[in-house]
Amino acid sequence: MAKKLRKRERKFRFKRPQWHIYLLLLPMVLLSVLPILYIVSTAFKPTGELFAYPPKFFTLRPTLDNFRKLFEASEDTVFPLSMYLFNSIVSTVAVVLIGMIISLVAAYALSKKRFRGRKLIFKMNTLSMMFVATAVSIPRYLIIKEVGLIDSFWANIIPMLAMPVGVFLLKQFVDQLPDEVIEAARIDGANDYQIVWKIVTPLVKPALATVAILLFQNAWNGMEASKMFINTESLKTFAFYMNTLSNSGNGVAGVGISAAASLLMFLPNVVLFILMQSKVMNTMAHSGMK
């Protein structure tokens, strides 16, 4: 027992050279954490501290008044908050499930199937990762209009399904699967769908978890569809609703309401990442992305 304790102590004891690494990483960690702490602190600040001088980073008298004002503002709207929340939950679940399937099938085809133009398609997929959503908003609107999805609930789902980074991550994992395993499954009579479902999927779960998180963040926080593609209020999402409420506040009170709305939108992302943190780290270690 004593030997085990000594081994455990040696395992977690910092060596002197490691302190240099932690000193370099500490500023980066602080820069990443400070915005989160600021949102949390501002959401719980009373009105008198929001623009106090000198400003205080942390509140000394935390309160739930900003959240109360946020929900009071939601009661004055025509449609209830629950309707927007339902729209977001349905569209987010659909985007995550369908997007994972599309990304996995595309990654398998680009990795293990041999067809003309395969390398060109993957290069185009990689190139598309360079463009932000704003750069393609007009072409996306024109496509949505041509296929007749304007002012449709599907406009919340279909534009979110294309995820080049998801295909890229999954392809790196599928590339590592031995071709002999795939060939053995084909000899046993398995078709491509059975290979993807029964062989590939269990072996790329870390990458799938990472893709699920990215899809969730895009769908849950996305407001593009509600702003550009949808005119009917009953089809809009929770993110758009929270953004509208936070912008409706005036002056000091509006800052507190905005921080409370931002915190409510941010919490599901944090919870999901914490639950899948180990799989995300595994994905980054094996995908070539650092």
Feature map (PLM): residue ranges:
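A hydrophobic, multi-pass inner-membrane permease signature
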Residues: A2-K290
